[in-house]
Amino acid sequence: MMLTELLLVRHGESEANVAAAEADATRALRVAVPARDADVRLSGTGVAQAEALGRRLGGLTDEEAPEALWVSPYRRARQTAELALTTAGLELPTTVDERLRDRELGILDTLTWRGVEQLHPEEAARRVFLGKYYHRPPGGESWVDVKLRLRAALQDLAGSGASRVLVVTHDAVVMLIRAVLEDIGESELLDLSRTQPIRNASITRLVRSGGGWIAEPVNDVSHLEGEALTTEHGGEHHGTRT
């Protein structure tokens, strides 16, 4: 079958999201991340968000429900997917793909922007000059680097045989999958990252239309609003770990 629909989901609020907000509030140089990035868990709110997502998925008809799951190997993404599917009562063939992991920040990992400016002023200057799209921190990735690995992942996903796929991943990956499939360039993508930062446990639906793809809805958190679970953690927008 041809791939016709992607449901892109950012993981629920993580312990690192909470720590990043605290670091910003206290003007800290570093985020007190409780584990290496791949092992960061969901917060209590993140768990509730994942369960609310599951109730949303459980309400889909057979014609709307995903047929397969592709998920980042990072714990917060896997935890979101597992909680959501359990709550929804769905059992899906699952692919854990490292190409869906969060962007690697290299020497800037766990730093707030204030920390980058004070501890690595030369990288702060390079980031300002090159812009977020092309800047590659030492030991890390630019957005373009992430796009390259996502192009390969999307080719494999398209050949997997499923027509509707749930993808649980990270905010930068959601934006960059849109960039690949909708052919969004640097300027428009940076505008989207500023004006529409991807929210925790949000759903962005991409549907094949003619020779291209259309996103509708984008960043949907209606399943969280009734339960007062919407959180604002800008992730890539603020330059902190997501």
Q: What residues fall within each predicted segment?
A:
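Internal catalytic-core helix/loop-beta-alpha segment
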Residues: 136-159
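Short glycine/proline- and acidic residue-enriched helix-loop micro-motifs
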Residues: 32-41, 125-144
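Short, well-ordered beta-to-alpha junction loops that form the rim of enzyme active sites
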Residues: 11-12, 71-75, 93, 99, ...
